[in-house]
């Protein structure tokens, strides 16, 4: 059995800003990111590319052309716990405290995560039985992946 472990937050951030750049280049305008969930053009492209990019990764790195028919690859999206619950907060005061400033500067709408958690990921898990999510209450996705590597 082969495994593909993906840090879901990283994947979401990457897709989000890739779509922002795509829209900037294709329309020569900056997309309205005030309430990204209401931006139909952005959300349609985000949903489309979330799956399409995953399938491209699977094809290029694992040689799988039809994920729905594959039985030898398991894809695990590791989810971050909420920032307030990260175990490192107990040891490092202000851990990731500067992230809010960066989000405001970059116009990142964190509601995209709720969209991915409640809509995009469940649809993919229903469509492709080889896709799963993994979550630990006080751990970030990269911590989860580090532990999973030792277990599989």
Residues covered by each model-derived region:
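Noncatalytic, basic helical substrate-engagement surface that gates or grips nucleic-acid strands
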Residues: 2-152
């Amino acid at each position: 059995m082969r495994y593909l472990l993906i840090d879901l937050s990283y994947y979401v951030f990457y897709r989000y800003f890739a779509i922002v750049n795509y829209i900037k280049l294709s329309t020569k305008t900056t997309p309205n990111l005030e309430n990204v969930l209401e931006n139909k053009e952005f959300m349609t492209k985000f949903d489309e590319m979330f799956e399409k990019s995953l399938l491209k990764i699977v094809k290029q790195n694992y040689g799988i052309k039809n994920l729905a028919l594959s039985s030898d690859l398991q894809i695990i999206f590791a989810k971050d716990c909420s920032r307030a619950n990260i175990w490192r907060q107990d040891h490092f005061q202000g851990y990731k405290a500067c992230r809010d400033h960066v989000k405001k500067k970059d116009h990142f709408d964190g509601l995209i995560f709720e969209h991915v958690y409640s809509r995009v990921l469940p649809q993919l898990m229903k469509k492709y039985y080889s896709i799963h999510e993994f979550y630990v209450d006080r751990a970030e996705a990269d911590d989860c992946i580090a532990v999973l590597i030792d277990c599989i």
